[in-house]
Amino acid sequence: LSIRYNTILVAVDGSDEAKRAFRKAALMAKDHEAKLLLTHIVDTRTFASVEHYDRTIFSEAEQYAKDMLNEYKGLAEKEGVTDVTLVLDYGSPKVKIAKDVAKKHNVDLIVTGATGLNAVERFLIGSVSEHITRHAACDVLIVRTETEQPGAGNDA
């Protein structure tokens, strides 16, 4: 019994966790001959606190996102992924990824990094990966960092 994925979504934000998730998603897309959906959500909540909504800051964030997506697209193509789609959207990343982007593009696997929140942050806001796992209608793969491996560094 083998499971084949047709459309794999990975969200990138410049973090190490996202890079690790991207690498795993690219390898899986190549192995499954699947479409790779690279997405970045510009978190509009971070702009809500900026006085008078500074348009230049927003434009810079948008340009940064476009450049980053194109850079990741190049890396994916170098890895041998032939079908890469870029999605730039706006809003709350955890809501947009799980509900809007995944549904709109018929995603059957979301690959996400295990976000590095401390216990207090996790309690207060919950991690993006946790929200996606709870609310996505498709499979979710959470890619752990080396330091988060169960039992890592516990050579007793």
Which residues does each predicted region cover?
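Structural beta-alpha unit
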Residues: 1-3, 74-110, 147-156
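Small/aliphatic-rich secondary-structure junction motif
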Residues: 2-55, 79
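Gly/Ser-rich helix-loop-strand patches that form or flank binding pockets
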Residues: 4, 27, 103-151
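Residue-level marker for beta-strand->alpha-helix junctions and adjacent short loops that shape enzyme
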Residues: 15, 43, 91, 117, ...
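Short, well-ordered secondary-structure micro-motifs
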Residues: 21, 48-51, 96-99, 122-124, ...
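Short, solvent-exposed amphipathic alpha-helices that sit
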Residues: 24, 60-72, 96
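General small-molecule cofactor/ligand-binding pocket signal
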Residues: 39, 85-89, 141
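Acidic, proline/glycine-rich short linear motifs
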Residues: 40-67, 150-156
